[in-house]
Every structure is written in C-alpha cells, then in structure tokens.
Amino acid sequence: MATANNPPSGLLDPTLCEDRIFYNILEIEPRFLTSDSVFGTFQQSLTSHMRKLLGTWMFSVCQEYNLEPNVVALALNLLDRLLLIKQVSKEHFQKTGSACLLVASKLRSLTPISTSSLCYAAADSFSRQELIDQEKELLEKLAWRTEAVLATDVTSFLLLKLLGGSQHLDFWHHEVNTLITKALVDPKTGSLPASIISAAGCALLVPANVIPQDTHSGGVVPQLASILGCDVSVLQAAVEQILTSVSDFDLRILDSY
C-alpha cells in the first residue's frame, strides 16, 4: 500500500517465508559478502570515510525519490562487490554509486529512478550518457550477477518467526529495514552476513513485549541466534556494530559533500 511518505509495496506473503526458502537463503548468502578492508589497500585512492559519505548520499537520493529500503541495500551491495574487483578513482566514485542505484532501482522498485534524476541529484557532475556507460561497465564487471541476498530480504522471515501473524508485522518490517539501510551506509556493517545484519536490526528494534509469550524465551537476541543457528556472542557483536553504525549516521555529513 502506498502513502504520501512510503513507496508502494505489497503485504508480506507468509508463503514466501517458508523454512525451505529461509534455509536456502542462509546457504547462498556467503556468495554476496563484501569487505571493508579494501579501502587504503586495493582501493588506493578511496577511504572508508569516502565510502560512508557516498553511501549517505545514496541513502538520501533514495529517500528523496521515495525508493524502497531494498533499493538502498542492493545498490550498496553492488557498489561494495564492485570495489572488491575493480579499482575506482575518486573522480568516478559518485558516478559509480549512481550506476549502482540505477541498476538496483530497476530490479527492486516499482518506479525506478531515471538517469535524469540521478544526474540532477549529483549536480550534473556527469551526463546521462556517461551514467549509462558506467551502468554498462558495472554490469560487465559483475558478469550481470546483479541480484543478492540482502539483509532487508531476511527481515520478513525473522519477524514471522518472532511475531507470527501479528497485525503489526508490516510496521516492524518497515522500521527494521529502514534501520538496516542506515547501518549499511557504514561498509563495516555491510561486510557482515545478511542474516546477521537483519537479526541484529530486529533485536535492536522489536521489543520483547510484542513477541508472543509462547515463543519468547530468554530474550530476543538468544531467540534470534537460535533461529539462525549462530552463537549468541556473534549476534550480540553484530548488534553493537549496527548500533554504532546507526549512531554515526547523519545526513548532515552531506553538507561537506
């Protein structure tokens, strides 16, 4: 359902959140892992701060054009995967991020962002044709593997496990995924497995008192760790990392961009 403040979206379908699909996601998510260790090493002209700055700009563009959280998450994943295999100069960094937004919006949005809008958002620092050429290069470098398992994809599975058929499921789904996209602006968070990021987001936002008593046992973090089959300490560390990333998130950083 669409509102003035939210992009059009459908209701969560429990059929798409069956255990077999969830376990398939857990199995293939390592294929899409990224790393923040490339900055200052393989990416000699880029720093982690520059990546965070670009990520914040990409988030703000999606917010301005009312794009879903999945678009931000996929665009950042595409960017970070590209940075693992291709050196990018400072001069082309924003154009590269814009190309990632262009591809991600085509895959994950009902109303993809236009090349004209992206050029405008970047203060016309590149032309439409230059952006299209950058999109082609991105697709070629990634061998057209443009989809990924995202943290925002896993949220629905975890919330259904926690909340069952709660009438507030869609509300928490939107809130958790918005938090996740803010955290993903930090490349350190993006290097974590998607399921861990999503579970940490759920742990930070979903209060224990909204979880049915027959499923709630020992706290939200241990319950989520049990669902994922991971150590509680691993998930707790991710919670702390995401809390740090979200605390550092500030759109005002763009004033110096």
Swiss-Prot record:
Gene3D superfamilies linked to this entry: Cyclin-like (1.10.472.10)
Membrane-crossing segments per the record: none
PROSITE patterns named among the record's database cross-references: CYCLINS
InterPro entries: Cyclin, Cyclin-like_dom, Cyclin-like_sf, Cyclin_herpesvir, Cyclin_N, Cyclins_cyclin-box, K-cyclin_C
Xref: Pfam families: Cyclin_N, K-cyclin_vir_C
Keyword vocabulary terms for this entry: Cyclin
PANTHER family in UniProt: CYCLINS
Family stated for the protein in its record: Belongs to the cyclin family.
Subunit comment: Interacts with host CDK6.
Entry function: Modulates host cell cycle progression and apoptotic signaling pathways by acting as a cyclin. Forms an active kinase complex with cellular CDK6 kinase. Promotes host S-phase entry of quiescent cells and activates host cyclin A. Triggers host apoptosis by inactivating host BCL2.
Name of the protein in its database record: viral cyclin homolog
Protein source organism: Human herpesvirus 8 type P (isolate GK18)
